[in-house]
Amino acid sequence: MAKLSLFRGCIVPNRYPGIEKATKLCLQKLEVDAVDLPGASCCPAPGVFKSFDKATWLALASRNIVLSERMGRDILTVCNGCYGSLADANIELKNDPEMKACTNSCLKEIGMEYKGTAEVRHIIEFLYKELGPEKLKSFITTPLDLKVALHYGCHLIKPSKERNLGETEAPVFFDELVEATGAKSVDYTDKMMCCGAGGGVRSGHAAESLEMLEHKLACIRNAGVDCIVNACPFCHLQFDRGQLAVNEKFGTDYSIPVLHYSQLLGLALGFSPDELGIEQNAIQNIEFLAKIYEISAGLR
């Protein structure tokens, strides 16, 4: 199994440090060799830098990759956006000698060189390929009696030819990891729809972003689930704090709990909600919190 450096990104340490803690606890329990990546910067955001200034995007992304190369480790992300930016940059630099040379001319100014010796992994992709659902089940100590609305997000599965995760229009690999915890992944209308956060939509087109989110939340609520599970802190932010904005704009009363997969897995591995930072969410659904505390205490 590959040795990893953990790339935290921006939203995790600044808004949801519980996701970082949950990820580290899970990796330790699963006996995965993962350490921090000192000196890392923003990935940078793929929908912004890559679209407007490709050379700067590659220089910034490659710097992060080189930090991990120097450690002799692959990079592990817990964010779809970071994964999209770093993985796409890595692929581009490995397959375009001219762009690699141009990028290395920039890196040379800070004493660095991109060699292409590190791979970029996403926590979901890594767990699915390196452990798999069946092996993951052997680590579960607290099966979760939860009904879950799973959100894949965009950059985890696309561009499909570069992700190598099989079917991308109706994927099942993430569902299988969710169900390895004992939870039930419930199908719902427009499951594969974007949450409305990425591509500059949340920051540049707030009204449209909230309309997309409200539609998705309505579909999820109609499915009768206990919570939403995602694999991206930006999607997590959209579903969590975005519910408050949706309620204010549309007069709705959404209060659907939101978990990153690391937090869901952490519960199934026997860690408490407090250890996993679940209380850091803006949405605090008392009924759901009571349920997961009971599950954690072995009362369900």
From Swiss-Prot:
Keywords in alphabetical order: 4Fe-4S, Cytoplasm, Iron, Iron-sulfur, Metal-binding, Methanogenesis, Oxidoreductase
Predominant place of localization: cytoplasm
Reaction catalysed by this enzyme: coenzyme B + coenzyme M + 2 oxidized [2Fe-2S]-[ferredoxin] = coenzyme M-coenzyme B heterodisulfide + 2 reduced [2Fe-2S]-[ferredoxin] + 2 H(+); coenzyme B + 2 oxidized coenzyme F420-(gamma-L-Glu)(n) + coenzyme M + 2 reduced [2Fe-2S]-[ferredoxin] + 4 H(+) = coenzyme M-coenzyme B heterodisulfide + 2 reduced coenzyme F420-(gamma-L-Glu)(n) + 2 oxidized [2Fe-2S]-[ferredoxin]
Superkingdom assignment: Archaea
Disulfides per UniProt: none
NCBIfam families recorded: CoB_CoM_SS_B (TIGR03288)
Its biological purpose: Part of a complex that catalyzes the reversible reduction of CoM-S-S-CoB to the thiol-coenzymes H-S-CoM (coenzyme M) and H-S-CoB (coenzyme B). Catalyzes the transfer of electrons from ferredoxin to CoM-S-S-CoB during methanogenesis from acetate. Electrons transfer from ferredoxin to CoM-S-S-CoB via HdrA2, HdrC2 and HdrB2. In addition, the complex can use electron bifurcation to direct electron pairs from reduced coenzyme F420 towards the reduction of both ferredoxin and CoB-CoM heterodisulfide. This activity may take place during Fe(III)-dependent anaerobic methane oxidation.
Protein name, UniProt field: Ferredoxin/F(420)H(2)-dependent CoB-CoM heterodisulfide reductase subunit B
UniProt gene name: hdrB2
